[in-house]
Amino acid sequence: MNENLFFINTYEDFLLGNLENLSIDKNIGTGAIVLSSNNNKYIEYGIYTSQVINLKTFKRLLVSWNCETPKGTWIEIQARAFISYYDDNENSTYEWSDWLSFGKWGTHIKRSSKSPDSHLAKISTDEFIIKGNYTDTASKIQIRALLHTENTNVTPSIRQFVISYKDNTPHLKSIEIPSDKIIDVPSYSQYIRDKNIVSVICSPTSITMLLNRRNENLIVEETAWSCFDYDYEAFGNWLFNVAFASSLGYESFVEYGNLKSLKREIYSEYPVAVSVKYTNDINNLEYPYIENAPITTAGHILVVRGFEKKDGIDYVVVNDPAGKSNESVTRRYKLSEFESAWHRGSNIMYVIHDKKVEINNNRIEASLELKNNKENLYSVLVNDTYLDLSSDFVKTILITYDNGLTFEYLVPYNNHYLALENKNKCVIYIIGSDGFTYVCNC
């Protein structure tokens, strides 16, 4: 693994920390922290605090988590750093920062990345950043996890933390690509999805490509609303996106990468998503130019699925969700141009490895009940209860007649009914704000 990664993911690893109202379950992956139980009921609240972790000097840091959060549970991940800085009198000083939060996470809550500020450090949505000038750095951290349940019959579980960090050293320049390597990945355009969110779902579209390669059969909007950060009011929180992948059982994390680590993943059969900034206008001097790019963007996520050499020039093979159709998503970018665009995107990469635990998806079977034959109005039933179709609850409703090749988008009639002219051999997906997707097979 890259030298800028630190893992906590085994029974022995978790034992090094302090567990308050928590236990380590050896039957989940290689070990996972869960709430302790009393008389077969889980305690409502627990805290894990890691040992002090020594790292190389860093200015920025990411903490990813792999977890399961059943309905009624959530977790919050925090970090603090031991920071070296010069005080107002130019004296060298060392001090722990305050505990800062990467946010409250759960698959069935309104996730939020909001964090209080500190005079030494801050969290900017998904990055822990040391304040001050380039000489203000840290080399020690601790992480803390708060686990909570409102239903004492279930507990959240955390099976892995991954820390990635970077300093002020220059990024790694081009390295030799030994041979062509291209991984099959489905191609999805963000621009043919729900028109209300098409311009801002590059990240969940990329995550969906990576997961559907593994036959998860996810819908882009389903992924998007499962990653949505209600404080950031956006779908692009890096840590929330990989946390969603982990909620399906996958080992996943965000890494400050370089070409060496990108090559490591591709040649191990793992495509990755990366953060870039680029322009397709050669006269635009604000962003790095990429020939054949579909747009100009101040921040974007795409999938890297391979390397290729043609006529002596190295290329990366990508699935860029900014392509206007599924057929135009796969593209080849010159490696040198891609490097510059990726560097401007902080060299972020989403890494998704194999599934470590089996976790059921968040889909619930539903059925249709005809309410008005003349106007073809239907209610949606879930276990004999009518589903709320108001905009307060429903995020997106999709219908497909061709097994998901194409979708139409539905707006409920009067917040209560679906108007269906033709329900022959269709499947309807209702994505709720409760973290579940309700599926009607017509």
Regions inferred by a protein language model and the residue ranges of each:
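Non-cytosolic beta-sandwich-type ligand-binding/adhesion modules
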Residues: N2-Y165
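Noncatalytic regulatory segments and standalone regulatory/sensor domains
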Residues: N4-S23, A32, I53-K56, D87, ...
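Active-site-adjacent structural segments surrounding the nucleophilic cysteine of cysteine proteases
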Residues: K140, L146-F235, K310
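Aromatic/hydrophobic beta-strand junction motif of beta-rich domains
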Residues: V63-W65, Y378-S391
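Surface-exposed, short loops/turns at beta-strand junctions within beta-sandwich domains
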Residues: N133-T137, Y417-K425
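Edge beta-strands of extracellular beta-sandwich domains
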Residues: Y409, G435-C442
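Conserved active-site-adjacent core of cysteine acyl-enzyme catalytic domains
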Residues: K41, N217-K356, L410
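Short, aromatic- and glycine-rich surface loops/edge beta-strands on solvent-exposed regions
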Residues: I141-L147, N424-D434
